[in-house]
Amino acid sequence: MEAKAIAKFIRVSPRKARMVVDLIRGKKVEEALAILRYTPNKAAAAVTKVVKSAAANAEHNNDMDKEELVVSQIFVDQGPSLKRMMPRAMGRADIIKRRTSHITVVVSDKKEG
């Protein structure tokens, strides 16, 4: 049995979010939250929120035991970029891309995963 949670349009670069996500893939939920608590990264806060949501979905919707949950799948997809202009010298302008991410977390029982 598995449960899923998705956070969309998170204002953090997908590349930086993937670095955080790689730390907790395959770990137990409690262990993953402990790792994220001490990860000094903006993406860690967003990933923590999604992992907690997936665990709550598993507990509430599927009556699964929270201690046995494992992060079976976790991945980050690229969302739309916000394009901004940075004025430069001599009337020029540079484009700044504010990247967004979609974070997906799937938790399952230890028996299956």
Swiss-Prot record:
Pfam families: Ribosomal_L22. GO terms for cellular component: cytosolic large ribosomal subunit. It comes from the Bacteria. GO terms for biological process: translation. Keywords: Ribonucleoprotein, Ribosomal protein, RNA-binding, rRNA-binding. One of its GO terms (molecular function) is structural constituent of ribosome. CDD domains: Ribosomal_L22. InterPro entries: Ribosomal_uL22 (IPR001063), Ribosomal_uL22_bac/chlpt-type (IPR005727), Ribosomal_uL22_bac/org-type (IPR047867), Ribosomal_uL22_CS (IPR018260), Ribosomal_uL22_sf (IPR036394). This protein binds specifically to 23S rRNA; its binding is stimulated by other ribosomal proteins, e.g. L4, L17, and L20. It is important during the early stages of 50S assembly. It makes multiple contacts with different domains of the 23S rRNA in the assembled 50S subunit and ribosome. The globular domain of the protein is located near the polypeptide exit tunnel on the outside of the subunit, while an extended beta-hairpin is found that lines the wall of the exit tunnel in the center of the 70S ribosome. PANTHER family: CHLOROPLAST 50S RIBOSOMAL PROTEIN L22-RELATED, LARGE RIBOSOMAL SUBUNIT PROTEIN UL22M. Belongs to the universal ribosomal protein uL22 family. Part of the 50S ribosomal subunit. This is Large ribosomal subunit protein uL22. It comes from Desulforamulus reducens (strain ATCC BAA-1160 / DSM 100696 / MI-1). The lineage of its organism: Bacteria, Bacillati, Bacillota, Clostridia, Eubacteriales.
